[in-house]
Amino acid sequence: MMNGAKAIVKKYNEVSLILRIVVGLVIGAVLALAVPGAGWVGELGSLFVGALKGIAPVLVFVIVASALAQGSSKLDRRFGTVIWLYMLTTFLAAAIASITSFMFPVSVVLADAAQSDVVPQGLGEVLSTLLTNFVANHVSSLMSGNYIGILFWACMFGLAMKNIGSDTTKKFLADTADAVSQVVRWIINLAPFGIMGLVYTNVAGNGLAIFTQYGKLLALLVGTMLFMALIVSPFIIFLYLRCNPYPLVFRCLKESGLTAFFTRSSAANIPVNMALCEKLGLDKEMYSVSIPLGATINMDGAAITITIMTLAAANTLGIPVTLPAAVVLSAMSALGACGASGVAGGSLLLIPMACSLFGISNDVAMQMVGVGFIIGVIQDSVETALNSAGDVEFAATAEYHQWLKQGKPLPDFLK
């Protein structure tokens, strides 16, 4: 009996998560149409969202605190350009996502009737909420899912630990972060069952029309990412190198983005990016640091996902979002995106943090996370491809910009 169960689990894990989620989505829709009264199927979705709600605050705290505690302060000045490019493009990605959300507003059907806790009227109230949440009690922040407070106290704790913590203590903190990340991976591994339950609840209550709305949301996400990859990033590269940027852009998309599309992991794509940097003639001392750094802080796709999903939640609840408030959201999404690296479903799990700026409850935010998992088969692949290709593009741009300042010619493929 035990051997049979182990064989089933092994077979389940051998199938790719993408395929399992697609199967779960289809089964959920079919069951909703065939037996709409089977409430136990919908409970699987509730359990999945509940597990995410339970682990997400702890995950954000330990990941951020551990990253700051382990961080190195010995970063050479010549990396300033590449860090600036990584951060600039991540913010621009979030800002462009805000603009496209205003141009093409999208709302979605959520499983439960959703309302916001507080509807902010403008930038002043948003900033007031932000500042108040920053210094909220850290225990209550973890319990209530106040991600602004969680981030603030995690940063304080991590920086303090970096200065006074022993190596053993820092190792314990890193191991704790790894352990929590492992729990998240276990939960994500059960996503097909959760997705089946979420799709069942939505289709049983609203019919197949929900997929039209999800399609619009997915089109907005992918369209914004493509605009960033093919228009904005090349323009920034052109400003630095004063040459046609597309040979570099297309080479990075082909050799880095394509692989990342299928691995769905910037961290897993680091060896691919290292090899590409070598082909591009970059300084190994430079790219050996800038590529792993890019996999952590160059998160254009994640910033787009967080921003668009948050504004979709606001549209769904009828919350008016002013342009200045959207700028604050863009900055928060860009900063939050930098913490998405190496976390399963990282950008999706940071949606509640951004939603909290507009008084959107944790329950509603986690329903948006569930929607994100439904469309994540495509969204996450495109997001990772954009992130990973950008790592090499801007590492190369920073290096080639230095070449130009030194009077050294650009590589032949850029002339």
Spans of features found by a protein language model:
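Helix-loop-helix junctions within the multi-pass membrane cores of secondary transporters/permeases
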Residues: 255-337, 395, 408-415
